[in-house]
Amino acid sequence: MITVRAPATSANLGSGFDVFGVALDRPADVIRVERAERTTIEITGAGSQYIPTDPNSNTVGAVVDALDAPAHIEIDKGVRPSSGLGSSAASAAGAAVALNELYDRGLSRAELVPIAAEGEAVVSGTAHADNVAPSILGGFTIATADRVEHVDTEIP
């Protein structure tokens, strides 16, 4: 079993709204994955009763499909849904990192960003990296439609 922590994020930063993103220290989702014949999702924690566990309706289902990595996935929600802190992005980002490791796909963190962004399309209708990029890469990121940059800077 692989366990990862995926931090909350903010991508609502002034003139960089939905472009600039920053990872936060707290809260965070904890995602545990183990290989399985078919994908199942179990969710506990903040607002879990409002989140679908059907892989076709959950952000992590798209990540599983993109990585061809069926698994039993446990998500302990620390990032409350509809809080404006990238709840769905944290789950998708954490699943991408954990499944990449579990299945030894060898993808870099940067290569996982567009995969996790596909998970965002499940809940928002559009694949976007504004929240998944900082959740995966940490720190401050700039995400446009065709590019993501990680900015190495101290965040106060």
Segment roles from a protein language model:
Residues 7-12, 16-23, 82-92, 122-139:
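FAD-binding core of FAD-dependent oxidoreductases
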Residues 1-83:
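ATP-binding N-lobe of GHMP and related small-molecule kinases
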Residues 10, 53-61, 89, 93, ...:
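Electropositive phosphate-/nucleotide-binding environments in soluble metabolic enzymes
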Residues 36-38, 69-72, 99-115, 149:
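Phosphate-handling active-site elements
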Residues 28-30, 61-65, 93-100, 113, ...:
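Predominant activation on well-ordered alpha-helical scaffold segments within soluble catalytic domains
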Residues 85-109, 114, 136-138:
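DPxDG-like acidic metal-binding loop motif
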Residues 109-156:
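ATP-dependent small-molecule kinase catalytic core of the GHMP/sugar-kinase superfamily
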